[in-house]
Amino acid sequence: MNGLKPFIAKVASGQALTRDEAADAFNILMSGEATPAQIGGFLIALRMRGETVPEIVGAVTVMRQKMLPVIAPTDSIDIVGTGGDGTGTYNISTLAALIVAGAGVPVAKHGNKALSSKSGAADSLTALGVKLDIDPSVIGRCISEAGVGFMFAQLHHSAMRHVGPARVELGTRTIFNLLGPLANPAGVKKQLLGVYAPEWVIPLAETLRDLGSESIWVVHGNGLDEITTTGTTQVAALEQGKIRSFELTPGDFGVAQVELAALKGGDGEYNAKALRAVLEGEKNAYRDVALCNAAAALVIAGKANTLADGMALGAQSLDSGAALKRLETLITVSNGGHSA
């Protein structure tokens, strides 16, 4: 159990690990070769000193090597948030994923149970009837037949079980809150990634660039790990190897600004009903914010040239019933059936 000690000592002294050192350290963590005290000490030392891009790249590289992969179309996109923003909003990225799928772009969505809200994407999807505990081959079928597949993080990152108890006992954010969305089991190169704090917007864009992503936006919206309609969203966009930073307001999408209360969610059942209501035609603040995120994803995917185009495509996906059809097919295929 001495393998992690030199890395703990280096980080505790205020020094940064190289990419290779970080990979070695996280390989020890995720192979069950460190004690709970060592895991906690290492993670808190990293957090106190501040995680660097090479350290995150090294850690993600190990996670990707150890994950259970899913085969998906090469043009698939992921719409995912780190969670943990503490705002208790409804599942914006889940609804956005269905809208994007309805617009013809395959979505390989990575998600988890709730971190700080009452209901994570997994909770809502389960309430809708989507089966999550399924083989990678079935998830691949979901993506090819329904246009969207949901990958439950616990099932694809079993190596995380070695650090899970220590993370729970620490009870505070660590580097692992950032890693999950960076280790999509389908290996997507296109992504709309929301982060819980604005200081991570540019570093995570740099991380994904160094990991070989092609087209990504990392966003933080006025306290949310999503594009928001409550105020300004900060964006770092990776396009053709270059990162540019900019801000977006609700007006850039042609929607009204709202108070955070309008985006609040509830438990899995509540959020599932709210999501289905929008898919069935209800026009409200939930619809607007999901459309904003879907519009950005459609631009990232190359399906729309502008946000206005993306909003129009997203609205068409909802109003035509295409997004709802994607959900119904996802429910059928995930439960072992065949799409019509």
Swiss-Prot record:
<comment type="function">
    <text>Catalyzes the transfer of the phosphoribosyl group of 5-phosphorylribose-1-pyrophosphate (PRPP) to anthranilate to yield N-(5'-phosphoribosyl)-anthranilate (PRA).</text>
</comment>
<feature type="binding site">
    <location>
        <position position="81"/>
    </location>
    <ligand>
        <name>anthranilate 1</name>
    </ligand>
</feature>
<dbReference type="InterPro" id="IPR005940">
    <property type="entry name" value="Anthranilate_Pribosyl_Tfrase"/>
</dbReference>
<feature type="binding site">
    <location>
        <position position="167"/>
    </location>
    <ligand>
        <name>anthranilate 2</name>
    </ligand>
</feature>
<comment type="similarity">
    <text>Belongs to the anthranilate phosphoribosyltransferase family.</text>
</comment>
<feature type="binding site">
    <location>
        <position position="112"/>
    </location>
    <ligand>
        <name>anthranilate 1</name>
    </ligand>
</feature>
<dbReference type="GO" id="GO:0000287">
    <property type="term" value="F:magnesium ion binding"/>
</dbReference>
<feature type="binding site">
    <location>
        <position position="89"/>
    </location>
    <ligand>
        <name>5-phospho-alpha-D-ribose 1-diphosphate</name>
    </ligand>
</feature>
<dbReference type="InterPro" id="IPR000312">
    <property type="entry name" value="Glycosyl_Trfase_fam3"/>
</dbReference>
<keyword id="KW-0028">Amino-acid biosynthesis</keyword>
<feature type="binding site">
    <location>
        <position position="81"/>
    </location>
    <ligand>
        <name>5-phospho-alpha-D-ribose 1-diphosphate</name>
    </ligand>
</feature>
<feature type="binding site">
    <location>
        <position position="121"/>
    </location>
    <ligand>
        <name>5-phospho-alpha-D-ribose 1-diphosphate</name>
    </ligand>
</feature>
<feature type="binding site">
    <location>
        <position position="226"/>
    </location>
    <ligand>
        <name>Mg(2+) 1</name>
    </ligand>
</feature>
<feature type="binding site">
    <location>
        <begin position="109"/>
        <end position="117"/>
    </location>
    <ligand>
        <name>5-phospho-alpha-D-ribose 1-diphosphate</name>
    </ligand>
</feature>
<dbReference type="Pfam" id="PF02885">
    <property type="entry name" value="Glycos_trans_3N"/>
</dbReference>
<feature type="binding site">
    <location>
        <begin position="91"/>
        <end position="94"/>
    </location>
    <ligand>
        <name>5-phospho-alpha-D-ribose 1-diphosphate</name>
    </ligand>
</feature>
<keyword id="KW-0328">Glycosyltransferase</keyword>
<dbReference type="GO" id="GO:0004048">
    <property type="term" value="F:anthranilate phosphoribosyltransferase activity"/>
</dbReference>
<feature type="binding site">
    <location>
        <position position="93"/>
    </location>
    <ligand>
        <name>Mg(2+) 1</name>
    </ligand>
</feature>
<keyword id="KW-0808">Transferase</keyword>
<protein>
    <recommendedName>
        <fullName>Anthranilate phosphoribosyltransferase</fullName>
        <ecNumber>2.4.2.18</ecNumber>
    </recommendedName>
</protein>
<dbReference type="InterPro" id="IPR036320">
    <property type="entry name" value="Glycosyl_Trfase_fam3_N_dom_sf"/>
</dbReference>
<dbReference type="InterPro" id="IPR035902">
    <property type="entry name" value="Nuc_phospho_transferase"/>
</dbReference>
<dbReference type="GO" id="GO:0000162">
    <property type="term" value="P:L-tryptophan biosynthetic process"/>
</dbReference>
<dbReference type="GO" id="GO:0005829">
    <property type="term" value="C:cytosol"/>
</dbReference>
<feature type="binding site">
    <location>
        <begin position="84"/>
        <end position="85"/>
    </location>
    <ligand>
        <name>5-phospho-alpha-D-ribose 1-diphosphate</name>
    </ligand>
</feature>
<dbReference type="InterPro" id="IPR017459">
    <property type="entry name" value="Glycosyl_Trfase_fam3_N_dom"/>
</dbReference>
<keyword id="KW-0460">Magnesium</keyword>
<feature type="binding site">
    <location>
        <position position="226"/>
    </location>
    <ligand>
        <name>Mg(2+) 2</name>
    </ligand>
</feature>
<comment type="pathway">
    <text>Amino-acid biosynthesis; L-tryptophan biosynthesis; L-tryptophan from chorismate: step 2/5.</text>
</comment>
<keyword id="KW-0057">Aromatic amino acid biosynthesis</keyword>
<comment type="subunit">
    <text>Homodimer.</text>
</comment>
<dbReference type="Pfam" id="PF00591">
    <property type="entry name" value="Glycos_transf_3"/>
</dbReference>
<feature type="binding site">
    <location>
        <position position="225"/>
    </location>
    <ligand>
        <name>Mg(2+) 2</name>
    </ligand>
</feature>
<keyword id="KW-0822">Tryptophan biosynthesis</keyword>
<keyword id="KW-0479">Metal-binding</keyword>
